[in-house]
UniProtKB/Swiss-Prot annotation:
Its cofactor is Zn(2+). It comes from Lonomia obliqua. The gene is RpS29. PROSITE patterns: RIBOSOMAL_S14. GO terms for cellular component: cytosolic small ribosomal subunit; ribosome; rough endoplasmic reticulum. This is Small ribosomal subunit protein uS14. It is found in: Cytoplasm, Cytosol; Cytoplasm; Rough endoplasmic reticulum.
Amino acid sequence: MGHANIWYSHPRRYCQGSRSCRACSNRHGLIRKYGLNICRQCFREYAHDIGFKKLD
């Protein structure tokens, strides 16, 4: 049993380790509001395509 088998062998059903960005699979800076599940970097890139508009 090598290091790779042991390191991520525990099941991740909840908490930060179980969620990732749907665009880039990043786990940091995740926006979960409204069921987006997208990281903040990808949100800035795809916000207009999703339908968010910047207010002046």
